[in-house]
């Protein structure tokens, strides 16, 4: 600790000192608010709104607003906010993250900033990690908010559009992070303003903020449509991979291995060696999937390479019951940070299809991205952002760097007395498991409940089998049994209870020492008062037993890549001043040690074990683990920061496109925009054939006539104009062409009416914009995947990506204008007389064909035999609709056939 810190205190301490002055002010108001009647207390909400309208700020009314919520909570919920919860609430009204230890009442704390900021009327979003927590927190706090005149909504998957709109219209909306992000994307795919759900993104309060803004940061939210089917190719290529041999390190000038591929476990990437490439190519040629003499890396084989690499990654880097589970014939992803299954989510880049082929389940078609956004960029759209979690301080630098959020550590209401014991290291996993089982046996004998944390479904099941063998009764909480999560967590605090859990560890639900009598009461159908009293008495007895045994004991079966996840596991114990203990058991075979400690360090540590099954505890061990975790955290931070720098480029473009879409949805008449675009497009086309300020000899009039005819359906005799009028120069010629285009368009508008034409313009613009944006997203994906290769040419990939993506975006906007004007100019508007004439001609023709016993289809398309139908008795203009009813111009339909005859 520096001298300055000793004198002035840390920044965190200085912030807390300042906030404690506000707490004193709020506490002084308590007697006055206690004296208010219910109606007077309820009336405070309207009073605060009026004061805000009158020019007061949120900070000015904060003490009174917090005092109001505290008093209402006492009356409605029977809970009084602690002073530390008031401090947490004040931190959350600013752009800050409140680190509040597990069990300190984050749900109740959130009511303070939510009420205060909802007074502005812009809406408040309380963001949770799953549906269960969103529903639970909303129902818990609903009586309090409704007492104060605030409406509460819940936004979870599966709601109808009306229910969603109602949820978003509420003053305070509880929602999952994924549903908020997807609704934002859906809003920007809507075809009318009535289809949109979200209003202004004002204030988001993110619960478990580290899970959402750090762990989920690399996961983009994607809405996709079906792309071309290629499942057969995944199944074919899947047969090749088992024959490939792994090589420990990449080939260099000094080292030439004999394997077919190498793995980078840190970044989860696989690479073919030269030997592997040849082997794959030989196999593909033998299977008839690639012609002889071709290369896997040739441009024409890029799709085949994509399938091979996806299959290689699926077999070598993604494990069943670790990264995913197979359930009901489908591959379900397991969240590496929480251990929860993520139903409905699919890996991109063909990886999910490759894993489906590997596991022998139905291979679904690949998808094409229609809209996407990362959590990083979605949550940065909010005017105000705040978050709370039990473990944020280790990631404080990242929160500040990426989101501009300062982390404030909130003191606990009662001192934390948990005993965090030194880590124990073993030579291998078997010795480690033996020690864990002995520790569990000891706890069970002393009637101390145990929570054992594992990093994967696979490890939880291995340990479960070992406990079964040892005859120890236990519960398992992992991705396969997540439906029973609340029930298992409710039982985890009973005397001698043993619970094995993946990283999820019942996060968001307290483990109550002695068990949860309320959960037991909920199982009973209409419990009597006597039954409830009996359950309470039983709980008090069990609670006393567990307290004497030392509270909840936490066992970590290995260190996670992030210290934060380890702290979350430890945080299940020692809540609100309860006793508790924790210890991590490690082995040299653990993933963290294998991937992030070099072979030299591992060998050095291996030599320290002189007796089989011996345990090692030392300060050096703690330093080695801390060093490995710091490396991993730095690696992942760089990855997230790098991803954000690339995504920021796409984000600027996304913002521009969505702004354009919203303009289109909010305006019924976009004719001015269409007119401006028409001028740009026609002038752009004319420039290509009549360069500005050029000589007449440089003009390509024939090319211009053909282009205008082909793309815009305009038959203009420009050559004749020039012959007839010697004074027709470049500028007047441009004006004449544009005037004719506008005149023809006005004639169409007069036929159908202004409103109908404006509606059509809007529809064409939206449809074209969506289609081109979808294609642009696919192009951006391909660019992103290959841009690193520019590094070999001594170019900065990030700068190249920015440059290329800007060029592609500009081309897309030009293409948008061109396609819209081309569609609007070519559209054929029929008069009532023309439609009636076409219908008569169609019926006459059908009658003639039927008389000759020739088939005619329902769409009135002419058959091969009807090509010689004689229309010479009726004079038909070349540009008139063909009387056969095909919808084509006569010159492009039967007119051309008559001419040939």
From Swiss-Prot:
Q: Name one GO molecular function term.
A: ATP binding
Which ranges are annotated Polar residues under compositional bias? 849-866
Q: Where is this region: Disordered?
A: 836-901
| Pfam families in the cross-refs | P-loop_SecA (PF21090), SEC-C (PF02810), SecA_DEAD (PF07517), SecA_PP_bind (PF01043), SecA_SW (PF07516)
List the subcellular locations: Cell inner membrane; Cytoplasm
Q: Which Gene3D superfamilies match?
A: Helical scaffold and wing domains of SecA, P-loop containing nucleotide triphosphate hydrolases, SecA, preprotein cross-linking domain
Binding positions for Zn(2+) per the UniProt entry? 882, 884, 893-894
Where, in this chain's numbering, is ATP bound? Answer: 85, 103-107, 510
Q: Which cofactor does it need?
A: Zn(2+)
Biased composition annotated in UniProt, kind: Basic residues: 888-901
Keywords assigned: ATP-binding, Cell inner membrane, Cell membrane, Cytoplasm, Membrane, Metal-binding, Nucleotide-binding, Protein transport, Translocase, Translocation, Transport, Zinc
Principal location class: membrane
The note on the cofactor says:
May bind 1 zinc ion per subunit.
SUPFAM superfamilies linked = Helical scaffold and wing domains of SecA, P-loop containing nucleoside triphosphate hydrolases, Pre-protein crosslinking domain of SecA
Q: Name a biological process GO annotation.
A: protein transport by the Sec complex
Q: What is its EC number?
A: 7.4.2.8
Q: How does it sit in the membrane?
A: Peripheral membrane protein
Which segments show compositional bias classed as Basic and acidic residues? Answer: 836-845
Can you state which reaction this protein catalyses?
ATP + H2O + cellular proteinSide 1 = ADP + phosphate + cellular proteinSide 2
Record's InterPro entries? Helicase_ATP-bd, Helicase_C-like, P-loop_NTPase, SEC_C_motif, SecA, SecA_CS, SecA_DEAD, SecA_motor_DEAD
Q: Which GO terms describe its cellular component?
A: cell envelope Sec protein transport complex; cytosol; plasma membrane
Q: How the protein assembles, per its UniProt entry?
A: Monomer and homodimer. Part of the essential Sec protein translocation apparatus which comprises SecA, SecYEG and auxiliary proteins SecDF-YajC and YidC.
Q: Member of which family?
A: Belongs to the SecA family.
What does the UniProt function comment say about this protein? Part of the Sec protein translocase complex. Interacts with the SecYEG preprotein conducting channel. Has a central role in coupling the hydrolysis of ATP to the transfer of proteins into and across the cell membrane, serving both as a receptor for the preprotein-SecB complex and as an ATP-driven molecular motor driving the stepwise translocation of polypeptide chains across the membrane.
This chain's protein is named Protein translocase subunit SecA
> Whose protein is this, by species?
Haemophilus influenzae (strain PittEE)
């Amino acid at each position: 600790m520096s001298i300055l810190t000793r004198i002035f205190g840390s920044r965190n301490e200085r912030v807390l000192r300042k906030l404690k002055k506000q707490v004193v002010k709020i506490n002084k108001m308590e007697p006055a608010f206690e004296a208010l009647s219910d109606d007077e207390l309820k009336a405070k909400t309207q009073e605060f709104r009026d004061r805000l309208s009158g020019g007061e700020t949120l900070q000015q009314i904060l003490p009174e607003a917090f005092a109001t919520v505290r008093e209402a909570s006492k009356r409605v919920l029977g809970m009084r906010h602690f002073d530390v919860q008031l401090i947490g609430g004040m931190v959350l009204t600013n752009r800050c993250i409140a680190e509040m230890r597990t069990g300190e009442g984050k749900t109740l704390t959130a009511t303070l900033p939510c009420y205060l900021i909802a007074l502005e009327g812009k809406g408040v979003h309380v963001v949770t990690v799953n549906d269960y927590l969103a529903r639970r927190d909303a129902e818990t706090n609903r009586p309090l908010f409704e007492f104060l005149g605030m409406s509460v909504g819940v936004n979870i998957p599966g709601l109808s559009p009306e229910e969603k709109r109602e949820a978003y219209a509420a003053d305070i909306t509880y929602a999952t992070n994924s549903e908020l992000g997807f609704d934002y994307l859906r809003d920007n795919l809507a075809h009318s303003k009535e289809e949109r759900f979200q209003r202004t993104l004002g204030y988001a309060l993110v619960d478990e903020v580290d899970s959402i803004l750090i762990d989920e940061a690399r996961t983009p939210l994607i809405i996709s449509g079906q792309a071309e089917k290629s499942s057969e190719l995944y199944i074919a290529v899947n047969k090749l991979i088992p024959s490939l041999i792994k090589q420990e390190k990449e080939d260099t000038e000094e080292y030439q291995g004999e394997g077919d591929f190498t793995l980078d476990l840190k970044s989860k990437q696989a690479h073919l060696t030269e030997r592997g490439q040849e082997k794959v190519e030989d196999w593909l040629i033998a299977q008839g999937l690639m012609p002889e003499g071709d290369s896997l890396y040739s441009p024409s084989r890029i799709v085949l390479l994509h399938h091979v690499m996806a299959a290689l990654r699926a077999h070598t880097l993604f494990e069943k019951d670790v990264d995913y589970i197979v359930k009901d014939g489908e591959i379900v992803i397991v969240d590496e940070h929480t251990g929860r299954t993520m139903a409905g989510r699919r890996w991109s880049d063909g990886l999910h299809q490759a894993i489906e082929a590997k596991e022998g389940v139905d291979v679904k078609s690949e998808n094409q991205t229609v809209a996407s956004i990362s959590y990083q960029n979605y949550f940065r759209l909010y005017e105000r952002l705040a978050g709370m979690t039990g473990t944020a301080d280790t990631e404080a630098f990242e929160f500040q760097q990426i989101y501009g959020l300062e982390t404030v550590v909130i003191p606990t209401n009662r001192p934390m007395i948990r005993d965090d014991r030194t880590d124990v290291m073993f030579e291998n996993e078997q010795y480690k498991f033996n020690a864990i089982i002995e520790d569990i046996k000891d706890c069970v004998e002393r009637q101390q409940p145990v929570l054992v944390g594992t990093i994967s479904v696979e490890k939880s099941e291995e340990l479960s089998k070992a406990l079964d063998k040892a005859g120890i009764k236990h519960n398992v909480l992992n991705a396969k049994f997540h439906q029973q999560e609340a029930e298992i967590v409710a039982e985890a605090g009973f005397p001698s209870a043993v619970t094995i859990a993946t990283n999820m560890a019942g996060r968001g639900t307290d483990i109550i020492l002695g068990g949860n009598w309320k959960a037991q009461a909920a199982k009973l159908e209409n419990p009597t008062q006597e039954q409830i009293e009996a359950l309470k008495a039983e709980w008090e007895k069990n609670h006393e037993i567990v307290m004497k045994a030392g509270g909840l004991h936490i066992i970590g079966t290995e260190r996670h890549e992030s210290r934060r996840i380890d702290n979350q596991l430890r945080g299940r114990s020692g809540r609100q001043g309860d006793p508790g203990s924790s210890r991590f058991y490690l082995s040299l075979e653990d993933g963290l040690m294998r991937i992030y400690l070099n072979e030299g360090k591992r060998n050095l540590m291996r030599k320290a074990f002189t007796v089989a099954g011996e345990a090692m505890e030392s300060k050096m061990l703690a330093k080695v683990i801390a060093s490995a975790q710091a490396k991993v955290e730095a690696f992942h931070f760089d990855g997230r920061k790098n991803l954000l720098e690339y995504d920021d480029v796409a984000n600027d473009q996304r913002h521009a496109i969505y702004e354009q879409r919203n303009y289109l949805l909010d305006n019924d008449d976009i004719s001015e925009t269409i007119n401006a675009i028409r001028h740009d497009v026609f002038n752009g086309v004319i420039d290509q054939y009549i360069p500005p300020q050029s000589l007449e000899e440089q003009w390509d009039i024939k090319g211009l006539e053909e282009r205008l005819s082909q793309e815009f359906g305009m038959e203009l005799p420009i050559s004749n104009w020039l012959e007839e009028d010697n004074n027709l120069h470049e500028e007047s010629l441009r004006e004449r062409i544009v005037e004719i285009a506008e005149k023809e368009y006005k004639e169409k508008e007069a036929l159908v009416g202004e409103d109908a034409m404006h509606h059509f313009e809007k529809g064409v613009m939206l449809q074209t914009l969506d289609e081109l944006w979808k294609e642009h997203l696919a192009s951006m994906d391909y660019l992103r995947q290959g841009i690193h290769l520019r590094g070999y040419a001594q170019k900065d990939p990030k700068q190249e990506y920015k440059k290329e993506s800007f060029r592609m975006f500009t081309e897309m906007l030009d293409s948008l204008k061109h396609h819209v004007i081309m569609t609007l100019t070519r559209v054929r508007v029929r008069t009532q007389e023309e439609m009636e004439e076409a219908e008569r001609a169609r019926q006459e023709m059908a009658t003639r064909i039927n008389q000759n016993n020739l088939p005619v289809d329902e769409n009135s398309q002419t058959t091969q035999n009807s090509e010689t139908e004689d229309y010479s008795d009726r004079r038909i203009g070349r540009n008139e609709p063909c009387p056969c009813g095909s919808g084509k111009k006569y010159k492009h339909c039967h007119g051309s056939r008559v001419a040939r005859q």
